[in-house]
C-alpha cells in the first residue's frame, strides 16, 4: 500500500511506486521536487478504491475523514467529488481548472494532448447569472476548450451540459 501524508489541504508521498504508478501512468497529482502531491479530491478517490492510504502522523485517515477535511475547506466539495469520481470512473484524466476559472480541466485519455473540456460544478439549486455563464464560456472559447456545466442533483446524480457560443 502506498502511504501519503496529510499536509494542509493536500497529501504527499515520496514513494517511487506512487510517482511511477499514479503520476507517470495514471496522471494523478503534481510532482514537485521529488514529492507527489495529491489534492484532497484525488486522495479521497484513491483511498476509496484502496490504492493508497493517507496518514496524519501515524493515524490512518478514513474516506469519511478525508471528505470532512474537504468539506471544511470547500462548501462544494461533495458535488466536486461526485463529478471528479464520475469522470475518473469513465476513464478521463481530471486536473484542476482553477487557472481557467473552472473547477476542472478534463483530458480524453492520458495527457498527451491539451485538455478538451473545462468543467464547472454546480448543485442543481444554484442560481446562475447570465454574466457568470458568459464569462466562463468566453474563457473556454478563448483557450479552445469546451465549457461543460456539471449539475449535481439531490440524489447525487450528475448531468452534463455543454455550453457554447452560437453564431447566426
Curated annotation (Swiss-Prot):
Give the keywords, sorted: Lyase, tRNA processing
Disulfide linkages recorded for this protein, renumbered to the chain, are none
Provide the Gene Ontology terms for cellular component: cytoplasm
Q: SUPFAM superfamilies from the entry?
A: tRNA-intron endonuclease catalytic domain-like, tRNA-intron endonuclease N-terminal domain-like
Q: What is its EC number?
A: 4.6.1.16
Looking up NCBIfam families in the UniProt record yields:
endA (TIGR00324)
Q: What is this protein called?
A: tRNA-splicing endonuclease
What InterPro entries does the record tag this protein with?
Answer: tRNA_endonuc-like_dom_sf, tRNA_intron_Endo_cat-like_sf, tRNA_intron_Endonuc_cat-like, tRNA_intron_Endonuc_N, tRNA_intron_Endonuc_N_sf, tRNA_splic, tRNA_splic_arch_short
Catalysed reactions, as listed in the record = pretRNA = a 3'-half-tRNA molecule with a 5'-OH end + a 5'-half-tRNA molecule with a 2',3'-cyclic phosphate end + an intron with a 2',3'-cyclic phosphate and a 5'-hydroxyl terminus
GO annotation (BP), single: tRNA splicing, via endonucleolytic cleavage and ligation
**Recorded superkingdom:** Archaea
Q: What does this chain do?
A: Endonuclease that removes tRNA introns. Cleaves pre-tRNA at the 5'- and 3'-splice sites to release the intron. The products are an intron and two tRNA half-molecules bearing 2',3' cyclic phosphate and 5'-OH termini. Recognizes a pseudosymmetric substrate in which 2 bulged loops of 3 bases are separated by a stem of 4 bp.
Which PANTHER family does the annotation name? TRNA-SPLICING ENDONUCLEASE SUBUNIT SEN2
Q: Which organism is it from?
A: Thermococcus gammatolerans (strain DSM 15229 / JCM 11827 / EJ3)
According to the UniProt entry, its GO molecular function terms are:
lyase activity; nucleic acid binding; tRNA-intron endonuclease activity
User: Subunit arrangement?
Assistant: Homotetramer; although the tetramer contains four active sites, only two participate in the cleavage. Therefore, it should be considered as a dimer of dimers.
Q: Record's family? A: Belongs to the tRNA-intron endonuclease family. Archaeal short subfamily.
Catalytic residues of the enzyme: 107, 114, 145
Which gene name belongs to this protein? Answer: endA
Q: What Gene3D superfamilies does the annotation carry?
A: 3.40.1350.10, tRNA intron endonuclease, N-terminal domain (3.40.1170.20)
